Amino acid sequence: MASFAASQTCFLTTNPTCLKPNSPQKSSTFLPFSAPLSSSSSFPGCGLVHVASNKKNRASFVVTNAVRELEGYVTKAQSFRFAIVVARFNEFVTRRLMEGALDTFKKYSVNEDIDVVWVPGAYELGVTAQALGKSGKYHAIVCLGAVVKGDTSHYDAVVNSASSGVLSAGLNSGVPCVFGVLTCDNMDQAINRAGGKAGNKGAESALTAIEMASLFEHHLKA
């Protein structure tokens, strides 16, 4: 009988023992190649051993109570209060972002509980959002701005500082702070993302704020 190669694979059901061709064990049963295989392990001198598992014993977290899915909703936002921090730099663009955010809030019945705070530029978004968050008046804060790339490295410094500032504001205040700052190569890209053919980043940020406010209020509230 031809000898097995050193890397010959053994298929077992119960006893993970390498079966030799010249001394077969009648008590062991080979699994057909079509049998379901759910796990594998290695044994010395036996190569890769596949062990079949009973489907009935497989834990399914999808159909048990072991896993809960938590998420925010945008259907009921009447009770939430929001703040919008808007950078005045590139106001032609940022005002459109603000209008998109306000329109979205109105669509979801957030009509009066909105404060709009203007700051000089994207640098000032983070510290302002943090102060608003710590005031305890708001369920979420939207930060809007537009940074257009120029010929110097100033663009990278502003973008990095603005993004990290808004992130820190949310972490330090415990209130969701949404980053709605456009970072574009040119003004045309910014305009297209402020109500043009690429949508409105302000509207998207407002929707994110509603969902996050709902998530924190209904699931993550201390």
UniProtKB/Swiss-Prot annotation:
GO terms for molecular function: 6,7-dimethyl-8-ribityllumazine synthase activity. It is found in: Plastid, Chloroplast. InterPro entries: DMRL_synthase_chloroplast (IPR017420), LS (IPR034964), LS/RS (IPR002180), LS/RS_sf (IPR036467). It comes from the Eukaryota. 5-amino-6-(D-ribitylamino)uracil binds at F89, A122, Y123, E124, A146, V147, V148, F179. GO terms for biological process: riboflavin biosynthetic process. Coiled coil: none annotated. It catalyses: (2S)-2-hydroxy-3-oxobutyl phosphate + 5-amino-6-(D-ribitylamino)uracil = 6,7-dimethyl-8-(1-D-ribityl)lumazine + phosphate + 2 H2O + H(+). The active site is at H154 (proton donor). The keyword Repeat does not apply. Pathway: Cofactor biosynthesis; riboflavin biosynthesis; riboflavin from 2-hydroxy-3-oxobutyl phosphate and 5-amino-6-(D-ribitylamino)uracil: step 1/2. (2S)-2-hydroxy-3-oxobutyl phosphate binds at D151, T152, R193. Oligomer forming an icosahedral capsid. Catalyzes the formation of 6,7-dimethyl-8-ribityllumazine by condensation of 5-amino-6-(D-ribitylamino)uracil with 3,4-dihydroxy-2-butanone 4-phosphate. This is the penultimate step in the biosynthesis of riboflavin. This is 6,7-dimethyl-8-ribityllumazine synthase, chloroplastic. It comes from Spinacia oleracea.
